[in-house]
């Protein structure tokens, strides 16, 4: 018996199983080490090759998901082939009674792992029958968890885009959302929407923590970009909290809840792969609100308050840049003044 083949096979199986279980079951820890390295390498490669072209980047997520599954299968399959190859007589042809060749072992390991079943090759002896049973169980586990993981990721991608659409339908930047929320007396019309956005963002944060691959699902449509939506929502909340007189602001608890949800999102994404930008993004222009007759604090007072949350806004810009996006006010024309309602 060749012990080198056994050791190499067990190492491949162990590496694959650790990454597989880490990624699919250990939801608190995100992706496994192999998947994490593959994700970073693939995303950087796509950005470099495409020049941040949205159409090319939109393929990074699906490609990464497929490559992850292929790597898991390859590690498991190769590991079992090496284990069977440690003994030349581990598998026998049922008709000729001859030992299986390398190609036969590859074939046998594949159909046993995918639980297909066949009769032209058979394990030779009790030990190899037990090994075959273990491989079948591992294959069934892999298929079941992989399908569940695939469905969960695709469902999370849809929810991610739904969140972006619900936020960006209110406005393309924070100032526009604040303007649209004014009912002529105060901003309480947006209270319910803040509660809904906080709830959706909380779910999205949990999904990003469980499935870091979501970071690399890039939408070609501005309206479906969750990182843009988070930045726009946070800018709107910044204006509500620091740029609007308190008597006109939305419900304070709703503002606090929404800002807390965004902070949790930032902490989750920051832990994964994001670093703050070197400079803070441009400040929201609240002078447009004043021009529309909406009560707002002085620009100087607002600037002082915004400077106090500089690190938070730098992290937001870092997320935008890492996602191959531009800060919202740079993507949307905001030069035109909003007309009063």
Swiss-Prot record:
Any one Pfam family match given in the protein's UniProt record, by short name: Ion_trans_2
Membrane topology: Multi-pass membrane protein
Compartment annotation: Cell membrane
One annotated Gene Ontology cellular component of this protein: plasma membrane
Record keyword Transmembrane present: yes
Principal location listed in the UniProt entry: membrane
Membrane spanning stretches: 6-26, 63-83, 137-157
Gene3D superfamilies documented for this protein: 1.10.287.70
Keyword terms, alphabetized: Cell membrane, Membrane, Transmembrane, Transmembrane helix
Protein name (Swiss-Prot/TrEMBL): Uncharacterized membrane protein YdjJ
Phylogenetic lineage: Bacteria, Bacillati, Bacillota, Bacilli, Bacillales
Gene: ydjJ
